């Protein structure tokens, strides 16, 4: 324990003494040269790094002895604070010149290798410090004597020892006799064995000195200052150790040094003349070492130079190769880029062609979306999702080779798909709404599979989590802004839900129920629902939030926020272009309630009732899809309110898309397979090509003409009814009741006559009902148009009504009165079958002549004429159910044999007139009368054909 503490104290004192000597050397160099750029108490590495380039040493020796170093290389500044390895020539030249100057001044030096940073051996730093302190002593000795003073450098006795070195500085004159261990070491430097012995002596001497516990520091300081005689003090120290005297005496007498035989010897017997000899030998050896080191460094420098030249050439070759490879790589990248562009172009064209084929076939597009697994520890049933729309699922109850099931859809979105990815695929379909097409997108799947997330987004959604409802409206507003120079759009929205088979308005203040589900001509499936106009996405977001608040939502064991109703978000678009054409379309965004199993959802009470209604409506939807897939003649749309509202979308003339949502957990495998099979069945449904709801300006003009025609016909027939009812009161003008036994001859009439006239026989009691206007409308459209009237009808078309009025006297004749009615309408040239009409008057025979000019396209008016044809067929059916009036002289030809002519006074009068040959003017009579009188001819213009007989009148 005592020995270890002694060694620690000894090492500490030695380190302090070495630091003190370095401090003295640095302070002296700063006073001579200037700032060195190192701390006042530097470490050994910092001290050596500062002196490595030799500039400081050369400048210091030139200060002491001007001209000692003739050339100093000064291209490296030691004041910059960066101690980097200087160039080799500067290192060797400055250090070599400094060592040569030291040799000239006969001052102790050191080896150039002592300045190597990586070669700090024991005692190397001590040599450099001793050299600088020697320069200091030489400088101080030279100043008082004006350059002629005596100088004696005293080195540290243990400068060769790293672990036991001490650094006292001793100053004395050269003539003084003292123990100089450096002289002994230099004298015996020629033999390595003696050097080892000297080291042992010095170590033993140092141990004895420090073990004496004397205050040597004060003595050393006094010796350094020159206040005391160093020789006397040293002799005093040695006198206390008689064994050292015997050791030195034996050493000098025998010529050999052994640590075990050390004896004391007097200091006077130490040789002094050998000091110069050892110094010269050391200087010669140092010079030889410097030359050898310089040659070695020159050889290494030449090798490095050759290596640098070779490396430079290799670098140039490598640069050429690199440029060539870069050019080849650029060409390959360009080819790959061109190929990739061509590939994507072909893919886009194929996609457009595929969508075109789908539009022509009218198939329902089916997209499948798989939500992420909520519990990461559970295994999923989704095995593979392909980019081509393929989907592989695994049945957990079967082995792997038999468990895989394959499905194919238009597109499949994996768990990592975002809302924007889903909307990007549906965007072309949604944008077709702005072109006049009806579009329906509905989400189908098990409860908790993510339907509401896809359509509306999660509660408290961010901008990146918005559903298709919001993104679709935002895209429609963007298109409206782009087309504002060509089209003017108006967008309206409705939001309803089907809750327990009742339609409820979600945007109404009281969320009232809508009892009727009808479809009007304006394209509204629910005209009673509240409709709101929207102009920005902000309006849409507010309405969506209001509707979601009113929607029926509840919590079950399968889903914390389960939708208990079918939500339908309807977007109505009305557009008008600059030419006056219009379009209308509707976008249905349907969020179906999820199918659920009651045993898994664990619902009771009202929730159970809701689940039953939900499953029933989804079952009806499945029945409709199956009927459409099998192309049945009857589609059960009316089995559910859901299918009734989706009738326009599923029944054709619309573009339809279904999202099939899947839950990937194993416990939901049954519902997943059911959803996939339903989606696969939906994908086989062909609805036919969708039809755009556009109307050009010409079509609108033709429809307006049809409406004007209908109004004109109604006004004209009402006038005819009014005039006919006023002229039935004369008792003298009742026509003869005759029978017609042959059916009408339409073909013969069309050949013989060029005019289109009709006979409207009214009831003898007069017309008492406005239904005659419809009969007149029917009769006005029966028969061909008159060629003569078509030639003469260049002015305004008119209708002429000829009536036979009662004469004021028996001898007066009937006069024809023509009532012209403005009917600027176009009557098509159609020949319809003649229908027998009841209700002809016994007093008057009404003749109607229609003269109008036909213009416009018949194809655009055909729809209106079909409507009129339905009225005709309807009137025929009604007439078949009404029994014939026995008082009417008119009837069907086949029933004439069962009808007897009334024996009235008027008939007798007519018979007498026929016998006498006197007939009232204008009185019509049949050629097939029972008397056989000659009928009156009217060759002027009126040839009237009735469904029962052909009469000719003469004026």
UniProtKB/Swiss-Prot annotation:
Gene Ontology cellular component? microtubule; microtubule cytoskeleton
Tell me which stretches of the chain form a coiled coil: 692-719
The segment annotated Disordered runs over: 878-942
UniProt-annotated binding residues for ATP? 445-452
GO molecular function per UniProt: ATP binding; microtubule binding; microtubule motor activity
Query: Entry's InterPro entries?
Result: CH_dom (IPR001715), CH_dom_sf (IPR036872), Kinesin-like_fam (IPR027640), Kinesin_motor_dom (IPR001752), Kinesin_motor_dom_sf (IPR036961), P-loop_NTPase (IPR027417)
Q: Where is the signal peptide?
A: none
Keyword ATP-binding recorded = yes
Kinesin motor domain location is: 363-685
**What spans are recorded as compositionally biased (Polar residues)?**
894-916
Q: Name one Pfam family in it.
A: Kinesin
Where do the Calponin-homology (CH) domain residues begin and end?
19-140
Keywords, alphabetical: ATP-binding, Coiled coil, Microtubule, Motor protein, Nucleotide-binding
Which BP terms in the Gene Ontology apply to this protein?
microtubule-based movement; microtubule-based process
Q: Does the keyword Coiled coil apply?
A: yes
Q: Which family does it belong to?
A: Belongs to the TRAFAC class myosin-kinesin ATPase superfamily. Kinesin family. KIN-14 subfamily.
Q: What is this protein called?
A: Kinesin-like protein KIN-14L
Query: What is the organism field in this record?
Result: Arabidopsis thaliana
Question: Which lineage ranks, top first, belong to the organism behind this chain?
Answer: Eukaryota, Viridiplantae, Streptophyta, Embryophyta, Tracheophyta
